[in-house]
């Protein structure tokens, strides 16, 4: 019995120059993403978005490689929850020796999550290793991790009618107030 060529199923993908080009392009993109890191600077603290995390966001389809924006947005949301300081209660050990918690403060850092997502996607597409601060919608003067006062503040006691000025954690001056 002899069968002709029409009986055999044709392969879905045939080796061709076009296919080789597509595979080469996809491999190049994968290598680019696998070698990319983004280091977020929070004063002396750094949070690194490494290539393993970035790789877990990649979606490979026939048309190419894309980044799962929801996964990237979740990463940014978690980072914002960790490092945002605006409206976060702060506890101080006062000059008079008591602890006081200040709530609803309007000073501090807040990551602009939408703008940060846009910037992060641009960083990833560049394929370069990046070190930078996140995009903020609100920022302070100085920070180290979640400490955005860095020992610089004015303390006022209305009961004692007294003011203390601290710079870099050291008392600079104090005075009575009325």
Where are these regions (language model features)?
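Surface-exposed, secretory/extracytoplasmic low-complexity segments enriched in Ser/Thr/Asn/Gly/Pro
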Residues: 1-178
């Amino acid at each position: 019995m002899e069968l002709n060529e029409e009986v055999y199923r044709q392969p879905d993908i045939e080796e061709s120059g076009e296919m080789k080009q597509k595979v080469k392009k996809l491999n190049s993109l994968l290598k680019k993403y696998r070698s990319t890191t983004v280091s977020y600077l929070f004063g002396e603290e750094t949070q690194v978005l490494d290539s393993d995390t970035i790789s877990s966001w990649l979606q490979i389809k026939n048309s190419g490689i894309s980044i799962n924006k929801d996964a990237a947005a979740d990463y940014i949301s978690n980072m914002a929850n960790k490092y945002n300081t605006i409206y976060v209660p702060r506890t101080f050990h006062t000059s008079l020796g008591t602890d006081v918690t200040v709530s609803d403060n309007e000073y501090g850092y807040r990551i602009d999550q939408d703008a940060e997502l846009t910037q992060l996607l641009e960083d990833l597409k560049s394929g370069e290793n990046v070190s930078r601060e996140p995009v903020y919608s609100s920022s302070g003067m100085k920070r180290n991790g979640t400490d955005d006062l860095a020992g610089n503040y004015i303390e006022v006691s209305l009961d004692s009618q007294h003011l203390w000025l601290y710079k870099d954690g050291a008392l600079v001056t104090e005075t009575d107030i009325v």
